[in-house]
Amino acid sequence: MIFDEANFSPGGDRYITVEFGNEMNLELNFMAQGLAGALREAGTKGLVETAPCFASLLVHYEPRDISYGDMVTELKSLIGSLGSTDEIELDSRLFTFETLYLDPWTKECIDDYREKLNPDKEYDPDFVARLNGLEDRHQLVRVHSSSEYWVASLGFWPGLPFLQPLDPRAMIT
């Protein structure tokens, strides 16, 4: 669901979480990315950094330079100036890289894990296929490899991308 108005929540004494909705879709991510860009461009006093995610933006600010209330006021103003997500322009690049599916090296690692730690563990590709109502691991590969992906966020592990398929039919849980 896309919220009618953004929700603002304090995170300790120097963070604000701005939530635009509670689902994964490009419109919400563009709002988070657009607000992050608008904050940088505005040169907002006290801004330390931003961390956009699928449907939210974490804002790190310096409370000695700007209060929580003043930062929320600034955020609301910038959200109002963003306009439609159809009009938001984001810098992006296209990367192509090889992806291995069902390779023997990964299977060997999973088999080793199962043997030593969890003999009842289902093979991951089979589990993901079953969880998503797909016929088998081969259909999983076809579905996953059928779309280009948008990097919606970078994760806690340096450089770990949180990906969102541009074709919603390739959305996998």
Indicate where each model-derived feature is located.
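Conserved "landmark" site that anchors the functional core of diverse proteins
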Residues: 1-173
